[in-house]
Amino acid sequence: MKNPVLLMVLLALTACQPPDPPAESAAPAVATEASGVVVHLFEWTWADVAEECEAVLGPAGFAAVQVSPPVEHALVEGRPWWERYQPVSYTITGRSGDRAAFADMVSRCQAVGVDIYVDAVLNHMTGVYEGVSTAGTTFGEYDYPGLYGFDDFHHCGLTENDDIEIWDDPAQVRTCELVNLADLRTGTEKVQATLAGYLNDLVSLGVTGFRVDAARHMDPADLSAILARVEGNPVIYQEVLDPDPPSWSADYYPMGRVTEFQYSYMVSDIFQEGTVARLLPGTEGAVWDAASFLPSEQAFVFIDNHDNQRGHGGGGGVVTYKDGRRHPLAMAFMLAYPYGRPRVMSSYAFEDDRQGPPTVDGEAIHRVYGPDGLGCSGPEAPEGWVCEHRQPMVEAMVGFHNAVDGAPLVETWTNGRDQLAFGRAARGFFLLNRSETEPLVQTLPTGLSAGVYCEVVSGGLSVDGQACAGTEVAIGADGRARFEVPPMSAAAFYVDAQVAP
């Protein structure tokens, strides 16, 4: 799929981010800090993830892939996506493939510079009282043969049916059941050792990071004790759905980054209604003044995720692939602006909130690659696998993010409404036009040194480094340039995409 060229630079003249106590004392686990863009290949098979690393993600500069939970999980009628979040055992077998395919994926992705981060379900087991797993294992209520029994679960006794009813009560949230999911007693030695054993098994296969699903529903001391047993010091980011102002997230900072849902909601609102000027500090109604965001070094950010794009997890109203050009523009801003660590969502098309991934026969996942693979439809006419991460604007902005990572915000400009621009010290310059009718036409200071730069969304630097594959701009000795950005478009320049003198 190809989008039309998104930018024309007309001229450049003069210038152009009480529960159980821990089984034993443990220091808080401290995660390795990592930078770079994560992509969530939601519900992809291990074989397809490996192919995508080699063909797309490695060359584009993605740092890591978040993959769906690699566990033996409940087999639910209709095969909804959320059956993957109902473990029966920690055996690596399920809809995406077996252990051998998983190990092959990790090896092949790492060979092209892409890490694998696992979506780890540690808080609970299944929400069905009895059934059969994807591997044929029979399980019952609080009975998982050879793994857990009745005493390995919280039975909170705080509500009539042990389900959470008061969502701002830590005792209920951390010991009662989340929508009937059997809540593990994570303060015990047995459960901690079992969960840490699962994570260490994944680390032994080369996994370097974990998204902790439903972390808000685990006591931070329990989670810290579990992660303290994990080898390799993996990257950790934790799902904590917090109100504004946040009152829960800080408890999880010692273990790693925390999902910043307020960012998703507020940035989405702005791209829906159009006043993107509010995305820059110091402007009237600036989003940074209107919400209590987490500190940048603790925040894990995204425009949409697999829950809130379906209205789950406090979601609804976020920008998704169904919102046309607003979605890649929002992701472009996220990748350009210095706040948090970003994750890009890669979806499949869905009509209802429980619909599972594309299948061959209602059971097996229909692959992206292979002779019978569906490929990627793109968001323009979504069907099957949407693959938002392959959009030229998104791929180009991954390179921009990598080039400017760590550089402060400089040279900000807005028209007060639907257009903005900013630099990242002496590393790059970004422009965004949310107007549906008017081009962005301005002569602006960029913070970049004089030279000829390639606009990366329209093509970037040619292979030989001697010319631009797309549009070029000449920046003058005073660091200024004249730009024209068409409606509903973005443009980006950075020093690594500069034509050799």
List where the protein language model places each region:
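Active-site cleft segment of glycoside hydrolase catalytic domains centered on the general acid/base Glu
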Residues: 176-189, 219-227
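Active-site-proximal helices and loops of the catalytic beta/alpha 8
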Residues: 24-38, 52-58, 62-63, 69-88, ...
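Sec-dependent signal peptide recognition
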Residues: 2-8
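Alpha-helical scaffold elements lining the catalytic groove of polysaccharide deacetylases
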Residues: 186-198
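C-terminal motif of bacterial Sec signal peptides marking the signal peptidase cleavage site
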Residues: 12-15
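Aromatic- and acidic-residue-enriched carbohydrate-binding clefts of CAZyme catalytic domains
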Residues: 32-36, 73-107, 138-185
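Bacterial signal peptide processing site
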Residues: 17-19
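Boundary/entry segment of secreted carbohydrate-active catalytic domains
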Residues: 24-48, 178-188
